[in-house]
Structures are given as C-alpha cells and as structure tokens.
Amino acid sequence: MASLIVMDRTGDTRHTFDIQDRAEVEKAERRFRDLTGAGFTAAVRSGPGEQRVIRSFDPTAEETLFYPRLVGG
C-alpha cells in the first residue's frame, strides 16, 4: 500500500491506495493534482532524513507528503 500524507492546520491525513488497483491509482493521481493545484508542495523520501520535491504523480512512491505553502506576514 502506498500513502498520500496531507499536512495541514489540523495535523495530518493519510490516504492509502493499492498500486495494483487502477481505480485507486487514478483517484490518488486526482488527489495529487488537486492538492498541488491548491498550492501544496509534494515530496517523497529520498533517503534517511531527506526528501525530494516532485512535480508529477509517482504511483510507485511508498509515501508522498503534501505540505501547504508557507505564508508570512
């Protein structure tokens, strides 16, 4: 199972999907597009304590983390 982890002001929400199930992968890809379109940054782990920002959906990533755009003021 792969996970999309969405960080927001309420904490985090995890959405899991089976990479072998086409319908679930399509739903996860739509969620990826919706979140990145709303300004979230998507990243995958690239090593211990490291992450890499991604711009397109990778269904083979074990975990994709989404975090909101930082706003200063």
Whereabouts are the PLM-identified features?
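Ubiquitin-like/PB1-type beta-grasp interaction modules and other compact soluble beta-rich domains
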Residues: 1-72
